[in-house]
Each structure stands twice: as structure tokens, then as C-alpha cells.
């Protein structure tokens, strides 16, 4: 697995030329299990970054709806979703190698075969590798809220990013976000509502109840016990 994660800067057209990162690169130390998974399962489930668009039918060995998850953490919920929906294909992107290793180990243990993972900046992957009109779902769960005002520009959900996601979704595809930071939820809602081509799937035109398809993470469970809220947003591509 190549170790060349970068996060380029957006230019005025939303292209990835930036040096402002939406993540802090915390590689951490690999456990023996994570290192074993990277060495043994990456050749099967890992996808190296490429300048060329990916062919999903070739990548997965079949034609099936593709869900892309950005920032899957340790991969527990992503593996659970892939296992629960074997008729679909899942591609996960995570910039921290311990999380990638943990996800690979879990997928192997659970016998999940419809999952592929990448260790690279998601913005560049979207621009370079994901074909337009190819995704059935894009998932972004609990991204860094960058809660200090001077850091708000680092939030991944900005108009250029949301427009980029829109271009990669099929007509009828859905962009599903979740955050436990209310101010970020409001920011997400403002950004998404400003873009022509998305339809808010909330009946109240704001947030949706957590769908059963999104597993509750340990982090989220701990937040519930502390009285923290969680906000889910789902927007469909309609044009």
C-alpha cells in the first residue's frame, strides 16, 4: 500500500489544488493485527490511487449498485453495511492506515467480499477515479466538525465538494451525511440546500431520522449516553 495521502486545494472551479486539509493525518502505530491485515488482505480488497477512472464492474467482478463511504474510521459500520447488503458493492476511503488495517481485518473475519478500500484523500479520488453518474450512494458519517470559527473552512462539506458529489451520483442517487455537531449539521443543511440538483429527503426539509441501514457506532452510543444529539441529512440527486 502506497503511503502518499494528500489533500489538494480547490481552485475557483472546485478542482483539487488546495493545501487546506479537511482531516488531520494521525497515522498512529499499527497493531500487529492491523499490520497483518494490510500485508495479507490489501492485495485482495485494497485499491491504489490512480489518475484513471475506475471500472466498477472490473473492480468488483460484477455489475451492482455502488456505495462510496468517505472517512470510514475503523470500518466497523462499513463492514456491517456491506455484510448486510451483499447484493451491493461498497468502496470505502480512509486516510489513516490503522483504520484501513482494522477494516480489512474485520471484513476478512466477517467473510465480506463486496467491499474495497482506499487510503487516499477522498477529494482527489472523486475527481480522478470516480466516473460521473456512477454512484448510487455517497456516505459521509461524522466528519471532523472543525468547530472553531477560524477552522470552519476546513470542513469537507462545502459547495464545491457537494457539487462534486452531485456529479458522481446517478440520477436518483443519495448523499447521506451524519454529524453529532449541531452547528455542522446546520452548515451542511445550508450548503446542500443552496445547490440546484439536490432534493432534501426530509419531510420537514431539514433532517431525517437515522435510517436502519446506518449502524449506530460505539462513538455514537457513547454520545447518546452523554445526551449528545445526532443529525442525519439525506439529499437525492434529481437533475
Swiss-Prot record:
Residue ranges of the region described as Interaction with RNA: 150-155
EC number: 2.1.1.33
Function per UniProt: Catalyzes the formation of N(7)-methylguanine at position 46 (m7G46) in tRNA.
GO cellular component, one term: tRNA methyltransferase complex
GO MF annotation: an example: tRNA (guanine(46)-N7)-methyltransferase activity
Catalytic center residues: 144
Gene3D superfamilies for the chain: Vaccinia Virus protein VP39
Protein name as catalogued: tRNA (guanine-N(7)-)-methyltransferase
Subunit structure: Monomer.
Organism (species): Salmonella typhimurium (strain LT2 / SGSC1412 / ATCC 700720)
Pathway(s) annotated for this protein in UniProt: tRNA modification; N(7)-methylguanine-tRNA biosynthesis
Key words of the record: Methyltransferase, S-adenosyl-L-methionine, Transferase, tRNA processing
Coiled-coil intervals: none
Membrane-spanning segments: none
GO biological process: RNA (guanine-N7)-methylation; tRNA methylation
Positions of substrate binding: 148, 180, 217-220
Highest taxon above the source species: Bacteria
Matches recorded under Pfam families: Methyltransf_4 (PF02390)
Positions of S-adenosyl-L-methionine binding: 69, 94, 121, 144
Family: Belongs to the class I-like SAM-binding methyltransferase superfamily. TrmB family.
Cited NCBIfam families: tRNA (guanosine(46)-N7)-methyltransferase TrmB
Reaction equations catalysed: guanosine(46) in tRNA + S-adenosyl-L-methionine = N(7)-methylguanosine(46) in tRNA + S-adenosyl-L-homocysteine
Amino acid at each position: 500500500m502506497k503511503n502518499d495521502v494528500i489533500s489538494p486545494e480547490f481552485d475557483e472551479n472546485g478542482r483539487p489544488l488546495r493545501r487546506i486539509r479537511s482531516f488531520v493525518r494521525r497515522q498512529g502505530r499499527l497493531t500487529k493485527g492491523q499490520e497483518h491485515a494490510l500485508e495479507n488482505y490489501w492485495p485482495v480488497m485494497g485499491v491504489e490511487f490512480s489518475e484513471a477512472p475506475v471500472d466498477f464492474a472490473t473492480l468488483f467482478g460484477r455489475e451492482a449498485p455502488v456505495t462510496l463511504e468517505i472517512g470510514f474510521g475503523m470500518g466497523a459500520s462499513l463492514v456491517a453495511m456491506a455484510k448486510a447488503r451483499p447484493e451491493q458493492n461498497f468502496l470505502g476511503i480512509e486516510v489513516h492506515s490503522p483504520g484501513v488495517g482494522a477494516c480489512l481485518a474485520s471484513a476478512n473475519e466477517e467473510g465480506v467480499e463486496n467491499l474495497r478500500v482506499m487510503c487516499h484523500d477522498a477529494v482527489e479520488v472523486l475527481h480522478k477515479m470516480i466516473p460521473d453518474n456512477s454512484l448510487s450512494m455517497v456516505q459521509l458519517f461524522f466528519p471532523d466538525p472543525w468547530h472553531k470559527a477560524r477552522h470552519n473552512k476546513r470542513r469537507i462539506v462545502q459547495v464545491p465538494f457537494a457539487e462534486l458529489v452531485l456529479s458522481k451520483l446517478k440520477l436518483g442517487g443519495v448523499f447521506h451525511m451524519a454529524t453529532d455537531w449541531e452547528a455542522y449539521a446546520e452548515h451542511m443543511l445550508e450548503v446542500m440546500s443552496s445547490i440546484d440538483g439536490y432534493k432534501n429527503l426530509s419531510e420537514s426539509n431539514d433532517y431525517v431520522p437515522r435510517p436502519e441501514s446506518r449502524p449506530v457506532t460505539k462513538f455514537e452510543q457513547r454520545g447518546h449516553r452523554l445526551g449528545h444529539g445526532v443529525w442525519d441529512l439525506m439529499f437525492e440527486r434529481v437533475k
